[in-house]
Amino acid sequence: AAPALLDAIAKEAVRRGLREFNPQDLSNTAWAYATAGHAAPALLDTIAEEAVRRGLRDFNEQNLANTAWAYGTAGHAAPALLDAIAEEAVQRGLRDFAPQALSNTAWAYATAGRAPPALLD
């Protein structure tokens, strides 16, 4: 029953679009599907597109880290999103990230096989 429910939620979210979701909603949704190990590629594509479209300045550091972690955990390629997260994190300064957020973010990029220049400079 749970996989069917997760499929139905993902389908409905994609159908509606995610413009009403705030940054935490986007982050938590990606995190939930990754944590559940439930593949929802259309939903993850839609979350990535919406986050990149609106920009990440309203995401807090935990939202950024959780989103990166979710895509790494899900094994879902979203290069534009991961590049945008890296740019936003560096622009803010990584000193504002909690240690757990830093480690989750580093893990996500390593798992995704991405080494964005913004994080390496």
Label every model-predicted segment:
Residues 1-121:
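Eukaryotic RNA-binding helical-repeat scaffolds
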